[in-house]
Each structure stands twice: as structure tokens, then as C-alpha cells.
């Protein structure tokens, strides 16, 4: 069953009249993971942020965005806020930017839960701890009393995921969630998303420039370049049998990097 339909989506910078995204179309079914790939500036993030109205006001949006039967572009800002977090959760690139540095992470998470649920304080704490345990966050009560600066980037990232899961959204949008992390933490966060994909009835849009990450988690893939969607299909067709020259370029670049790394590890790179 289709959860999200995006039709003829166009995003324009109203200050300069410059089109940033042009005539983008895609769908997402319930429980499916859609990978969105492309270089920096290709329009990946603003396309996905437009689903819940998180772009700056200067960016004008036209077209259709239908989420679970509701036209998102016809909603007022106050109506859209009801969808954010509860029905559509967003996991940002850097956990440090998602939390107010002057307040404990627990207080911020509790406030979000109170806005979107009718749970008591005790129920909220129990629910948050349950999902923090699920994501291997040790000593959750201590973490909830911590300020953001006291926690690592990987911990903050997993806290965002825990909060998202606690609200039981129909869709999680993950915007480059592994980019700002070290290699080991990247692996842990990616494994968390893969586990969510297996065990939760939740669709995901996973934005990344890392083709290895997308290959591990996506069911279908769309490729963006200069604000246009230039190729889409199953993970197998796009990442292993691409048709567009740009997709082939991305894949060949990734292969060259991997081959060079293998040569370095073998010690057969010479000046």
C-alpha cells in the first residue's frame, strides 16, 4: 500500500528565482526503504525536508506531496507540526544540532513525547529506556540526565533514533545519519537502521552519498543530480545494472576508491 506519493515536486529559491529541484516524482510503500543518492548539492536533503516543511521559508514548493492520504502542501504550519515526530520522524546528520545544548537530553525527549502522546511521565521514561536499551545505550537513566556536550556523536545519533521509534512513526527520514561519525560508530548506527527495517513496521527514506550504505539498507533507489531525479528502480537494477551515465560515474568512482584502498593495504602503491 502506498504511503507517500511525490508528484512534479519543484523547489525554487524565491529570492533568486533559481530552481533547486525540478519535477521530481517518486512513491514509497508502507514498510519500504527508499535510498536517495547523489553528490552534495544535488537536492537530496531539500527534497526530503519538503515532505514535512522543514526547508527555509525562502524556498517555494510546488507539486504534490501526499502522505497517508493527506496533502502535505495544503496544510498550515501548525497542522504540519502535528505530523513531525509523531507520523514522520527525521534523523539529522549531526545529533549535536538536534539537541539544545543548554538543556538535558532527557528533558528535551520528554517534552517531545508529551507533545505527541498522552503518556504519563512514568510511561514516557519507561518507553524511552526501552528503546535506548534496544539501541545498546548503556545506563539510560544517566544518559537522560546528561547535557548534549557530555555525549558522543554516536550516542546522540542513537538517542534521535530511540526518540523516533518511541513515537512509532509511519515514516523515518534519515538525512546522512552516518556521515559525521567515525567508522566504527557509522557501522553501529547503520546496523541499528538495518535492525529497525527488519523488526519495525516503518517506512524509511535514507539519504546518503555512500553507495555501500545504500546497498545495505535500501529496497529501491533514486539518483539525483542538479535537482533532478535521473534514475530510479530496485537496489539491484540501479546499483548493479545502472542505465544513466551519471549513476555509472558514481559507481565507477566508488570502485576506483575501493581498488586504491586495496592497493594501499597490500602495500603496492608507489610514488
Swiss-Prot record:
Give the enzyme's EC designation.
7.2.2.-
Q: Which Pfam families match?
A: ABC_tran
Q: Which GO terms describe its molecular function?
A: ATP binding; ATP hydrolysis activity
Top-level taxon of origin? Bacteria
Matching entries from SUPFAM superfamilies are given as: P-loop containing nucleoside triphosphate hydrolases
Any one Gene Ontology BP term: iron ion transport
Spell out the subcellular localization from the entry: Cell membrane
Q: Which residues bind ATP?
A: 38-45
Show which residues constitute the signal peptide.
none
Q: Which InterPro entries match?
A: AAA+_ATPase, ABC_Ni/Peptide_Import, ABC_transporter-like_ATP-bd, ABC_transporter-like_CS, P-loop_NTPase
Per UniProt, the keywords (alphabetical) are:
ATP-binding, Cell membrane, Cobalt, Cobalt transport, Copper, Copper transport, Ion transport, Iron, Iron transport, Membrane, Nickel, Nickel transport, Nucleotide-binding, Translocase, Transport, Zinc, Zinc transport
The main place the protein resides is membrane
- Describe the location of the ABC transporter domain by residue ranges: 6-251
Q: What switches on its expression?
A: Up-regulated in metal-poor media.
Q: How does it sit in the membrane?
A: Peripheral membrane protein
What is the reported phenotype of gene knockout? Deletion of the cntABCDF genes decreases StP intracellular levels and decreases the import of iron, zinc, nickel and cobalt.
Question: What is one GO cellular-component annotation here?
Answer: plasma membrane
| UniProt xrefs under NCBIfam families | opine_ATP_CntD, opine_ATP_CntF
Record note on quaternary structure = The complex is composed of two ATP-binding proteins (CntD and CntF), two transmembrane proteins (CntB and CntC) and a solute-binding protein (CntA).
Role of this protein: Part of the ABC transporter complex CntABCDF (Opp1) involved in the uptake of metal in complex with the metallophore staphylopine (StP). May be involved in the import of a large array of divalent metals ions such as nickel, cobalt, zinc, copper and iron. Probably responsible for energy coupling to the transport system.
Q: Write out the similarity annotation.
A: Belongs to the ABC transporter superfamily.
Looking up PANTHER family in the UniProt record yields: DIPEPTIDE TRANSPORT ATP-BINDING PROTEIN DPPD, OLIGOPEPTIDE TRANSPORT ATP-BINDING PROTEIN APPD
- According to UniProt, the name of this protein is Metal-staphylopine import system ATP-binding protein CntD
Q: Which organism is it from?
A: Staphylococcus aureus (strain Mu50 / ATCC 700699)
Recorded name of the encoding gene: cntD
